[in-house]
Regions:
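Pyridoxal 5′-phosphate
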Residues: 1-221
Length: 221
């Protein structure tokens, strides 16, 4: 992101980054990150739903979202969600205080889960093993499409995803994975797993066992 932002800045291009998935999970420092704007969402770091943040670097001008009042520096009229703002602030403080330890814990669970998944015949990991969020992984298994694996894991009690909430309902393979060079068949088989603050080693072991059991039912294995 820093390299892209610097590239844009050299050319006079305004640069915004969506940090919704990053906030509370990896360090974010807008003093060293050369972005003009950054957004995040409270519920992604265990704060209240319905509250978020838009950071604008000093001197960055944008048009008002809602006119008619002076709230939020005249960018969005209407009474502010004060309880939500306070809740988000508390969540951010807690996340920052626990961040180094939680990053290590989640990365350990993630790496163990990736290693286990790769022992399943036909399994692969999408993306880098290390250049990713500590609690994030994306995988696929040959002979299992994402939808069927998603349903069977749901029946087994595991909530995973075949894409982002922004692409919910789309039957097309992930644009991100295809942009990364994944063939359509592999991109269409991808399952995203997110580990969180309350995820335990026992739960990741149970998830791995469920995936292994489902993979064992493939007709073409």
């Amino acid at each position: 992101v820093a390299e892209l932002a610097a590239f844009a800045k050299e050319r006079g291009i305004l640069f915004h980054t969506d940090a919704v998935q990053a906030a509370g999970h990896i360090p974010i420092d807008v003093r060293s990150l050369p972005v003009d704007a950054l957004s995040l969402s409270g519920h992604k770091l265990y704060g209240p739903k319905g509250i978020g943040v838009l950071y604008l670097r000093r001197g960055t001008a944008i048009a008002p979202l809602i006119e008619g009042g002076a709230q939020e520096r005249e960018l969005r009229a209407g009474t502010e969600n004060v309880p939500g703002i306070v809740g988000l602030g508390c969540a951010a403080e807690l996340a920052a205080a626990e961040l180094p330890e939680e990053m290590r814990r989640l990365a350990g669970l993630r790496d163990a889960l990736m290693d286990g998944l790769l022992t399943i015949d036909g399994a692969w990991i999408n993306g880098s093993r290390t250049q990713r969020l500590p609690g994030n992984l994306s995988f696929g298994i040959a002979g299992l499409d994402a939808e069927s694996l998603l349903i069977r894991l749901d029946l087994a009690g595991f909530a995973v995803s075949a894409g982002s909430a922004c692409s919910a309902g789309s039957l097309e393979p992930s644009q991100v994975l295809t942009a990364m060079g994944q063939p359509p068949a592999q991109a269409g088989s991808a399952i995203r797993v997110t580990l969180g603050r309350f995820t335990t080693a026992d739960e990741t072991a149970a998830f791995l066992a469920a995936v292994r059991s489902i993979a064992g039912t493939r007709k073409d294995k």
